[in-house]
């Protein structure tokens, strides 16, 4: 700056005014270009992507609520799917504003309907044009929103107790197909209905980019005091060539372990007949799992069906000898009705 004014015949006051004017213009320029780099509506790219399709729904019969999502994006369930028993579920996607999840649940828990809760959140969000979100509350109120700047094909459909929404789809057939699948599979449990919706979306093209991750959450109709009991189902596939096939498999495994848990409770209550029934159901759903076969055999043993149990033990022990080591630890815990010596005799026969 000194070189600029070195040979000019101007006063110090004039030099000051010139420098001040340049600084003023620079400040104004910075103010004008700042919005281009801020996190407001004009720059959605600072938010995480989750261009995807999803469903939020309530089962009118059981009161369960669910949110399911699939996307060609890593770990889509991390930000998109939210739920709380006795309150509601939320899906927040497109250029994701993750605060919609916890804030939406908080508003619904305070007594505000899903529709009005979503309205409040979008009204104060400067990036609303790039958002897509949906909510269902415990009373069956449904809210859905698709910003005008969401990437096509984009939109949503609100039905009784549910909403399906999508953006960046291959075509405009995805949302109608999702809606149809949900309505036509009302006889299924809610989680299985969600999987049918996933499959329907893919059958007509799905996400224009393909598939990568999926998530499925189911919460109950009653609030729970224990946070670990809040989600009845909480499944995620973070990175897979076929996330829908994988989440379908995981749901089947989950159902098997539901029966395993019931069998464990029955053993605690010394109800061996019920334990046998529950372990048997678990094994039928997941026959290749040694854990389920082993505990079914334990239940048979405790019910006096030793020969039937022995056949299962022989298969399990052949596949993994450590299970035989485990069974010898059970008498001390009172889990089986045989002593170590009796086990020795039993297995030597």
Regions found by a protein language model. Give the residues of each.
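"A position-specific structural signal for the A-helix of alpha-solenoid helical repeats
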Residues: 261, 295, 329-330
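Alpha/propeptide regions of enzymes that mature by internal proteolysis
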Residues: 41-209, 216, 238-269, 280, ...
